[in-house]
Regions:
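General beta-strand recognition
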Residues: 88, 114-116, 141-143
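Short, intrinsically disordered, mixed-charge
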Residues: 60-68, 122, 138, 175, ...
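Hydrophobic ligand-binding cavity/cleft-lining segments
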Residues: 3-94
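A conserved amphipathic terminal alpha-helix motif
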Residues: 11-19, 149-183
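Beta-strand/loop substructures that line and gate deep hydrophobic ligand-binding cavities in soluble
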Residues: 119-164
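Intrinsically disordered, low-complexity proline-rich regions
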Residues: 1-4, 55, 175, 179-180
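Hydrophobic side chains in beta-strands
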Residues: 47-49, 89, 105, 133-135, ...
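Hydrophobic-ligand binding "helix-grip"
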Residues: 93-137
Length: 183
């Protein structure tokens, strides 16, 4: 099995190396670690999305069925979130841009749930992004951790605009999860 255990009841699985061929970067699974790879732009936000700790299961179900992403982007997925599943994300404001990703890690623990996806060839960036919901005494937090760098010529030329787009979508994901939480 490709699973890692981090204690009683912890379940954390990373895509086996033999299935990582289509990805456009190395360091698969690093967005879930404390060591993000050098040579990439790093993003990390952690925001309270619900003041009800009991919301973890409901919000986790929404996250693992692409509902958060669907509030921000056009989503074409091969199914729900599971190791090796693929998704094509299309910003409505950028016709012709497809951000294709593969789920490379899944977290299914009593107090944490989420996943990480990595970029495929048609993604303008290369890297990985993790979306983790975590229950605490005050509610449920959403952590988004990413490392990326330009992959296509257009992405390389976009410079600060590309970084602004990533920041924009990070904020939108947090806002979307708060709206899902509010019902």
């Amino acid at each position: 099995s490709s699973g890692h255990t981090a204690g009683m009841g912890a379940r954390f699985k990373v895509l086996p190396v033999e299935r990582q061929g289509p990805l456009t970067y190395e360091a698969v699974g690093s967005s879930l670690s404390d060591q993000l790879p050098h040579g990439f732009r790093h993003v990390h936000v952690r925001e309270l999305v619900s003041s009800e700790p009991s919301d973890l299961d409901r919000l986790g179900d929404a996250l693992m069925s692409w509902q958060m992403h669907a509030r921000c982007l056009k989503v074409q997925a091969s199914g729900g979130v599971e190791l090796g599943s693929t998704v094509s994300l299309r910003p409505s404001a950028l016709p012709g841009v497809a951000a294709d990703c593969m789920v490379v890690a899944v977290v299914d623990e009593p107090e944490r749930t989420g996943f990480a996806y990595g970029t495929l060839a048609r993604h303008p960036e290369c890297g990985e992004e993790a979306f983790i919901l975590e229950r605490s005494a005050v509610g449920v937090h959403l952590s988004i951790t990413a490392f990326s760098r330009p992959h296509t010529r257009i992405a390389r030329l976009s410079g600060p605009v590309g970084r602004a787009v990533q920041t924009h979508f990070t904020r939108r994901y947090v806002d979307a999860m708060r709206k899902i939480s509010a019902g």
